[in-house]
Amino acid sequence: IPAWPPLRFGDEILSVNGKSIDSIRSDIRKYVSCSNETAVGFRTTVYAFTSTDADEYVVEYRRGNATDTVRIATRTDRNAREFIDFPKYAVSEEGCMLINDRIGYIDAAQFSNEQGRRIMNVLKNTEAIIIDLRRYPSDFMIFAFLGKYFAPYAINHVIFTHPVYSLPGCFREDRPAIGHDNPDYYRGAVIALVDGNTISQAEYTAITVQALPRGLTVGSTTLGADGNIAEIPLPGGYKTLISSLGVYYPDGSETQRCGVRIDHWAEPTPEGLLAGRDEVLEAAIRIAESMQ
């Protein structure tokens, strides 16, 4: 979590109100709708600091070799999500930057299709482009950007299944394509960074990157919740959510619940976080350099 006085970045939370994090995780597991265990961890972080009517929590934490307790104010669900928001990198207004003269970087959370041409003017001479999908994309880049600049021809990148409402239990398949014949497509490697914050449209974008001639993912298990959202109303004004369509790779393998395929595993370490390093990005840079 980020600094939250008197807690500091890098402190290890051991318990909240006398309950261990594992115990909190076990308590909420049967009540929350989560696609996989990565999603449960996300919910545990939020729930641990929002699930009381009291004004404060008693938190036990470890800092270095010492342990201590502190009282901290209760958070709402909305601002508790600050704990899992990924750091924002300093990039240009176009949402991109050059890591070096051979590797470009795009932050999907700051990307805009309107800037697509300018982004490619900046990055077109690189040998690899890293697209960071560890925060939610600010624009839908799949057709207007990835398809336009990165596909040499029409590529079937995903399978969607939709229920046939007149025939319960039956589903129809859609196999959309991105791109068109384009001799000037970007020929370098395209690397998508993913982790436990990668969800829904971000996962669909990662799947699309993997369909490109030199596309791959670097990171760790995603939330496995791509597809649209359909509400199911419940008594008492409550509701729950499902996806009313299936999302599969072109070979028919699943993406929902399990998350997207990870081509190269990489995740942060406590030591790396404390040192201010982005070890997932570092891994992607090493892979990009090895592909040149």
Where are these regions (language model features)?
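Flexible, low-complexity junctional segments that flank or bridge functional domains
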Residues: 1-137, 152, 156-158, 231-233, ...
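Stable alpha-helical elements in mature extracytoplasmic
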Residues: 45, 115-119, 142, 146, ...
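Gly/Ser/Thr-rich loop/hinge elements
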Residues: 81-82, 137-193, 197, 227-233, ...
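Short, well-ordered alpha-helix to beta-strand connector turns
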Residues: 126-127, 187-188, 262
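Active-site rim recognition segments
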Residues: 248-272, 277
